[in-house]
């Protein structure tokens, strides 16, 4: 599901809100989440999951085009850990 599909689905389910209001709310929520992670804070949405930053240590990588070794710096990357309710709902799906 893309962001625009999410906005469309929410606007359909929340008929009292216009599509523009839903779009604004979704964009603001995502912006706040990004800002919170950017400041190094953790985000927890009970039943859904938590977002945090994990440190990825410096390592030697490989340029896939040329095959040469490249030194990659350490960095923080976003990490999502699903909550219990979300895990149970996904586990219940028979694919």
Curated annotation (Swiss-Prot):
UniProt-listed SUPFAM superfamilies: IHF-like DNA-binding proteins
GO cellular component entries: chromosome; cytosol
Alphabetized InterPro entries for the sequence: Hist_DNA-bd, Histone-like_DNA-bd_CS, IHF-like_DNA-bd_dom_sf, IHF_beta
One Pfam family named in its UniProt record: Bac_DNA_binding
One function term, GO molecular function aspect: DNA binding
Domain of life the protein comes from: Bacteria
GO process terms (BP): DNA recombination; regulation of DNA-templated transcription; regulation of translation
UniProt KW keywords: DNA recombination, DNA-binding, Transcription, Transcription regulation, Translation regulation
Classification via PANTHER family: DNA-BINDING PROTEIN HU (PTHR33175), INTEGRATION HOST FACTOR SUBUNIT BETA (PTHR33175:SF5)
Subunit structure: Heterodimer of an alpha and a beta chain.
Its biological purpose: This protein is one of the two subunits of integration host factor, a specific DNA-binding protein that functions in genetic recombination as well as in transcriptional and translational control.
HAMAP family (UniProt xref): IHF_beta
Family indicated by similarity: Belongs to the bacterial histone-like protein family.
Matching NCBIfam families: hip, PRK00199.1
Protein name per its UniProtKB record: Integration host factor subunit beta
Species assigned in the record: Shewanella amazonensis (strain ATCC BAA-1098 / SB2B)
Phylogenetic lineage: Bacteria, Pseudomonadati, Pseudomonadota, Gammaproteobacteria, Alteromonadales
């Amino acid at each position: 599901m893309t962001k625009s599909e999410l906005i469309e689905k929410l606007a359909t389910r929340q008929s009292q809100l216009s599509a523009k209001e839903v779009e604004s709310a979704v964009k603001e929520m995502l912006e706040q989440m990004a800002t919170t992670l950017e400041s190094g804070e953790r985000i927890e949405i009970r039943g859904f999951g938590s977002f945090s930053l994990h440190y990825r240590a410096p390592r030697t990588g490989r340029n896939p085009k040329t095959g040469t070794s490249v030194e990659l710096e350490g960095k923080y990357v976003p990490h999502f850990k699903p909550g219990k309710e979300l895990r149970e709902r996904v586990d219940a799906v028979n694919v």
